[in-house]
Design a protein with these regions (language model features):
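Outer-membrane beta-barrel biogenesis signature
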Residues: 1-15, 34, 119-133, 142, ...
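Repeated loop/turn-to-beta-strand initiation elements of outer-membrane beta-barrel proteins
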Residues: 12, 55-59, 109-113, 166-172, ...
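Residues on the lipid-exposed face of transmembrane beta-strands in outer-membrane beta-barrel proteins
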Residues: 45-51, 99-104, 115, 158-162, ...
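Beta-barrel outer-membrane channel/assembly domains of diderm bacteria
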Residues: 1-111, 160, 317-318, 325-333, ...
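Long, well-ordered mid-to-C-terminal structural blocks that present hydrophobic/aromatic surfaces
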Residues: 207-284
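Surface-exposed coil loops of outer-membrane beta-barrel proteins
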Residues: 72-101, 108-197, 201
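Transmembrane beta-barrel strands of outer-membrane/channel proteins
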Residues: 16-22, 61-65, 113-117, 172-176, ...
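Residues that define the transmembrane beta-barrel architecture of outer-membrane proteins
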Residues: 24, 35-43, 93-98, 152-156, ...
Length: 356
């Protein structure tokens, strides 16, 4: 065998797939293409590559295309969207090199340094059961902290991690920002040290009765000026949060999140979510996954409503073959925008996946 080809087979891996979603609303419509529509849809193929050029070093790249219709959050009907896969107008219908970064492990894998381009949520607020809208829950508040997610973007970054003692992992991260929630924006490659995102996270990963778990405490600062909700002037964006996941049996896991964000600049100063993930719930369907979760977003009292928007979601991911999956998903939103007098919104969705 040719040595070059043998080296590539050993050091390079490729993965890819395509996800398609169709979501139907009840008691809600959005204006799209000049008409009121009661549905949204999305299709998103991607290609991922990992190359290990040196020992304990890896280069990761992800190319993704997403085409979607508008959703409820984009039209200001809910505080958090019901289809997290959707992207905004800037990226809709474009092929994007979302991630391209290098990671070098150090000190016998007790530390690492990473740099390149990715989103902060590659490292922050992760969760074993509620973190991937392509395979798990689909609504934003059961995928990430919505306020962190709204500030998050794919941009140049540097991250440092260390494991000082067993089961404790520490991380610091700095990232260029386009100032996504400011009245004026900049390019992510322009003045990268100008009011960047800074974040830190501590993760405790114990084994409880032989079952893996992760308990994360994180904080972040978006250092550009945000318009104040409480009066004239500006303040920095910041937030702190917990993201927890714990296997309790071989096939059942629990998760929870809670976050507090600067109440002077964000529509949602408090957020929480809890849920369960079960493999093989149906007899003889060991590779299927069932998920059930509930989340709450407390509306800021300085906005028109001050109630709590509640999201309930259930999905069942059916394995048809090694490469094909299909997932019916149901969501219900109580008190949209924190308005206790508003009619609830029901959404049913079907997701199809092909992966290789």
């Amino acid at each position: 065998m040719d040595p070059t080809w043998e080296y590539l087979q050993r050091s390079v891996s490729l993965q890819g797939g395509i996800v398609a979603n169709y979501q139907q609303y009840a008691n809600a419509t959005v204006m799209d293409d000049g008409e009121n529509q009661d549905f949204t849809a999305c299709i998103s193929p991607q290609l991922k590559m990992t190359w290990e050029p040196v020992e304990q070093g890896s280069l990761y790249a992800r190319l993704r295309y997403t085409k979607n219709r508008v959703d409820l959050a984009q039209k200001g009907i809910v505080l958090a969207n019901l289809l997290e896969t959707n992207v905004g107008d800037k990226d809709n219908g474009r092929i994007r090199l979302q991630k391209l970064y290098y990671t070098q492990k150090l000190m016998n894998e007790h530390a690492f340094v990473a740099f390149g381009k990715t989103d902060g949520e590659t490292y922050l607020d992760t969760n074993a059961f509620a973190n991937d809208s392509r395979t798990q829950f689909m609504g934003q508040p059961l995928v990430n902290n919505p306020m962190l997610d709204d500030e998050d973007e794919y941009a140049p970054f540097v991250a440092l991690g260390v494991t000082p003692v067993r089961d404790l992992h520490l991380l610091v991260l700095g990232q260029s920002s386009s100032w996504p929630l400011a009245s004026q924006h900049k390019d992510i490659w322009e003045n990268m040290l100008g009011h960047p995102l800074a974040a830190a996270q501590a993760t405790f990963s114990p084994q409880l009765n032989g079952h893996e778990g992760h308990y994360r405490l994180y904080g972040w600062l978006q250092s550009y000026d945000h318009p104040s909700l409480t009066g004239p002037g500006y303040e920095k964006g910041w937030g702190i949060g917990l993201s927890l996941d714990q296997w309790v049996t071989r096939d059942m896991g629990l998760f929870a999140r809670v976050g507090h964000n600067n109440p002077h600049v964000y529509e949602v100063p408090w957020f929480w979510s809890v849920g369960i993930s079960v493999r093989g719930l149906v007899p003889r369907r060991e590779e299927d996954t069932f998920g059930l979760g509930i989340s709450g977003l407390k509306a800021n009292p300085d906005t028109p409503h001050d109630g709590t928007e509640i999201h309930l979601e259930a999905y069942y991911r059916i394995r048809l073959s090694e490469h094909f999956f299909v997932s019916p998903d149901f969501q219900y939103v109580l008190n949209p925008l924190g308005n206790n007098d508003e009619t609830g919104i029901f959404a049913s969705m079907l997701r199809g996946e092909f992966c290789f």
